Swiss-Prot record:
PROSITE patterns: DEHYDROQUINASE_II. The active site is at residues 23, 101. GO terms for biological process: amino acid biosynthetic process; aromatic amino acid family biosynthetic process; chorismate biosynthetic process; quinate catabolic process. GO terms for molecular function: 3-dehydroquinate dehydratase activity. The record marks 18 as: Transition state stabilizer. It comes from Pseudomonas syringae pv. tomato (strain ATCC BAA-871 / DC3000). Belongs to the type-II 3-dehydroquinase family. InterPro entries: DHquinase_II, DHquinase_II_CS, DHquinase_II_sf. It catalyses: 3-dehydroquinate = 3-dehydroshikimate + H2O. Its EC number is 4.2.1.10. This is 3-dehydroquinate dehydratase.
Amino acid sequence: MATILVLHGPNLNLLGTREPGVYGTITLPQINQDLEQRARDAGHHLMYLQSNAEYELIDRIHAARGEGVDFILINPAAFTHTSVAIRDALMGVSIPFIEVHLSNVHKREPFRHHSYFSDVAVGVICGLGASGYRLALEAALEQLAASAKP
């Protein structure tokens, strides 16, 4: 059984009401419940955290190593474009991760085109709405299964 941690960055607690034309109408609790059920059905454990505070996400990443977390799915949200500290935390714990974005950041303002995470992530999924989280979970489970084979 693998343990997967899902991290949601700033303002994602507003999903469902914040700019639904960009982010959709699904709420964060709905996304979390869906992922948790899919992980459980596959025989794995999933944990999640949403925070608007950079230090809380960093502390959670640090704790993940000691907890034996096997994979991280992260939507850094606005921290994507600003947080060297979260990048360093992810690199410091050496837990593979997939970067997820609900919107296609490359179709948006130029300042959203740069990510401090993409070049060190296993992969990046953007622009597919809440489906991106499901696809990221599927990819993580495939990666974990492949790494478990002798």
